[in-house]
Amino acid sequence: NGIQKNIRLEVIKTLKKWNGKLIEVPYTKNSSLLKNQSKAKKTFFTPMSRVSRFRRLLETQKIVRFIECHNPLVGLLAEKLSINLKNEFREFHGLWSSSLTDSASQGKPDNQSVELTTRINNLNNVIEVTNKPILFDADNGGRPEHLPYTIKNLERLGVSAIAIEDKIGLKSNSLFKDQSRANQDTIKNFCRKIKIACNARHSNDFLIVARIESFILGQDLNDALKRAENFSKAGADLILIHSKIDTPKEIFAFAKKFKKSKYYKPLVAVPSTYSSVKEEELISSGFNV
């Protein structure tokens, strides 16, 4: 009944054609689970091995949990926090390097007053004391000409992914009610930015997350879906669909439609304003992160 359920059923179906039978070893509750996890936390990961951890988690977990991290102390808290629920180990799998909290922690507004270079330099301090994969919130990624250098710097440090939003102009935090000064990039221009990011990375294990701001800027579901399909075709590895209303209604409607698309990619939710949503609801609706 886990993440391999459908594969198991397919194997059983195929074996029946040959009068075969699947031999299954009973699941063993891992009594040393916490000890193994503790050992893993003490392991040093090289930048290259750390980059690939997010992709591996996507392939093995029902949902990958990230928590924001704006300094080494927060990173250590996220690194060490864990609970054991009926022999099921729960933890945050990764760290979200947020432009909002990076800016707020330095007493500045979330409008790119803290530039990318400064944020990446500060991120190095977090990387020194943590091992979890990092997803870097890069706002709109900056100028297309500068984006390759951002990608190379992040990958060199061992960051696992970058999230780039389809907004242009002066940054305005997506949770603000007034978005009248915010503008959305054209699909064509943003697809070009995604391709630049994909071409700049050294390894395909470094993931490109396309963040869609259609609901934030008052656009409809069709606009969000059109963007998701085009961004997927351009090379995005994951799609982050953002919303600022206090329920997951918008993102669930999006996921229901996008799951049926031939251009489907894993989905990311950021439940800042709809934090009452249950993890199980996100999973059943098709979200992966």
Q: Residue spans of the language-model regions?
A:
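Catalytic machinery of carbohydrate-active enzymes
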Residues: G2-T43
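Alpha/beta enzyme core
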Residues: F44-S272, S276-F287
